[in-house]
Amino acid sequence: MPYQIRKFIFSIFSLQNPRSLYMNAESKNNIVIFDVATSNDKSIAKTQQFYLSKATADNTRRTYQAAIRQFEAAGGLLPATEQDLILYITAKAPVLNPRTLSLHLTAISHWHCYQQLPDPTQTIQIRKLLKGIFRSHGKPKRKAKALHPEHIEKMVTYLQQQNNLKALRDNALIQLAYFGAFRRSELIAITVEHLRFETQGLLVLVPMSKTDQEGEGKTKALPYGNNNICPVQAVKLWLEAANIKQGFIFRAINRWNNLQPEPLNLNSVNKIIKTLANKCGFDFVADLSSHSLRRGFATSAANVGTDFEWIKRQGGWKNDATVREYIEEGQLFDKNAAAKLITFAFNNKE
């Protein structure tokens, strides 16, 4: 919307609440709103809007939308002023994690950016206030617990003892996610068309990912395993039992054990892992998520001497620091200066 028109509309609503204008229509539910070029061909405008919306990842958009809704629920208005934000983050500091508040500010910043309005989040006052909140209320980032080979084996063994469609699906999902080090968004997007079975194993095309937003694509290879642990056979058995010939491979199953056409959603993957871990008797269910498989792969692969670059390539990580963090956490006792000192400086004494 051109500045002159926006200014005119603001003047019309000046006796009410001019800042409510932006959140009365489509932008209330969509964090990314753009001006679509006027065109006599409505299909062109619609297509343009579609492409513009794809400039932001779906997960990011949903996260920002949720943040905007929370800001509104607390009485916040858009466009926001510096004072609005000061009041908001000061009031929420005792109850929200500082990282959550920082994310809310990022969402609000993006909203103003896309509306071509001044960004109120970038003032010195806001930055200093947020820094003070982090210093006062900062907490260690909660991390998903890594699942190791012994956990995977126990989960797979349990599933193989069940005789139903869900167990076959979950077995394929757990093994593929673990040995492929897939993100859950990648996992639920896999289709039959992305799979290619070879004599050495299974090739899985990942057409787009968190670190490949422009869709260059990446292929992951999963080798055959043994009779109990084999991601390739697990996927084959699932596809045959579910008679899936095309489309998404990981789909919802209703309470009558009937396969549904739609794929699993992101929350379903976490629920499957937690439910299975609970049935296996794990005492750390609350610390698990889909990321436990991906983190566990990196940690466990490093523990058996796998080359760093191999681990990084399989997981599709671009940031070396992230992979090293996973690996180092899994080797806290193995590569431990205190352990070395105790062993050689004290245990050798008679």
Predicted feature residues:
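Extended, non-catalytic subsegments within catalytic or DNA/protein-binding/adaptor domains
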Residues: 3-350
